[in-house]
């Protein structure tokens, strides 16, 4: 945890470190090294800290390469998490920094059984899709058991227990059939007062539950380890943690300073950077820049390092957000959660903050290859106006008559965001999660130069991975400093003798 990570006090005295990038990895490294006594300088290309943790508020400018700049005009207090948007409760390190610096958190509703699933031209609530699928799968398995098709696969006692489990799991009738939708799937008419008994829905068929391949991931989503409840978000915007760490090291951070070259000067490093033609020299460097950008920066890296930096693909996720009155709450009883669709916008995120307030920011598209791996590239290629159109059409399907209430739209295509060009590295992992020699090479220091970032962790695409990688780089750097100290002391003893 962050509270338990601490270098020996004063262990960095007399040593200097330049850190490239003020995203989470860079900020964490700066904070930990600074309090250990290192002379720290952080160079950040943007006019803000946080990197891919980016909260857009009214008055902010959105720059995408090759496109007209956008200017957010959200009402006061409203915001859009254009990048990172949720934190799993198991991400102890980043949550540790939130705790340490007093960042207030609230629940992020990552699943809502009432939210719509729009697939195959039909919109149905998630609860009906999920629990009717439970019923249909259980029905098939119960039939197989009753027809003795599984007698050779399981012992009799286990089969009996499994058959009983299916009865409850799938809401089957006494004959093992899923003849009518369970109450878990919702109602044709809701239960009410004195004379309002509920009426059940007809059970959906497997064809209706599995209309196309795109629907597979939404069924699986909630089972992903990092997507299970409880999920969290900082109150007021995801950038709160980055800003809190930045506050601890603000004098050390220089914004608007893009790196133009990374050079080794003997046992030290020299960084060439903007604005203008400036240089910063230090004993050590920690590079937290994305690999796809680092590859293009002139450097003195070894041939193996340069080769390892090539060909790492980054996910070009795209989001679209609108301000709107909270019709999803007033008309559909949706307080947070996600809607899913086989349309190009893939995913809709209902805000988990400001419940019952007049307005909110609705993320009407979050395209990351959830339902089709080609969707991020296809959606990113659309003009901003086309992204808005596709997103509004999706909201209209989910909430008929309400798309006209969407206003103040903004869109961020991460493949076009300067100094990012993607939200995170995509590793083609082998058996057991192995990433091979390329990954191993990227982890290695280059003399006095160390490396960190979400791409150098097994918690990629998350703030947790960025923070963990910073800790790893710091430990390597600290070990070298300690070793240099021991070597120096040994020389002194030998000279004195």
Where are these regions (language model features)?
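Mid-domain catalytic core of redox enzymes
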Residues: 255-367, 398
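Short glycine/proline-rich turn/loop motifs
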Residues: 7-11, 71-80, 217-230, 247, ...
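Conserved flavin/dinucleotide-binding core of flavoenzymes
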Residues: 2-6, 28, 36, 268, ...
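N-terminal glycine-rich phosphate/pyrophosphate-binding loop and immediately adjacent elements
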Residues: 4-143, 494
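Rossmann-like dinucleotide-binding core of oxidoreductases
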Residues: 124, 132-146, 151, 294, ...
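Active-site/ligand-binding neighborhood in enzyme catalytic cores
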Residues: 145-258, 265-268, 281, 297-298, ...
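Core domains of carbohydrate- and sulfate-ester-processing enzymes
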Residues: 127-148, 198-213, 292-293, 428-444
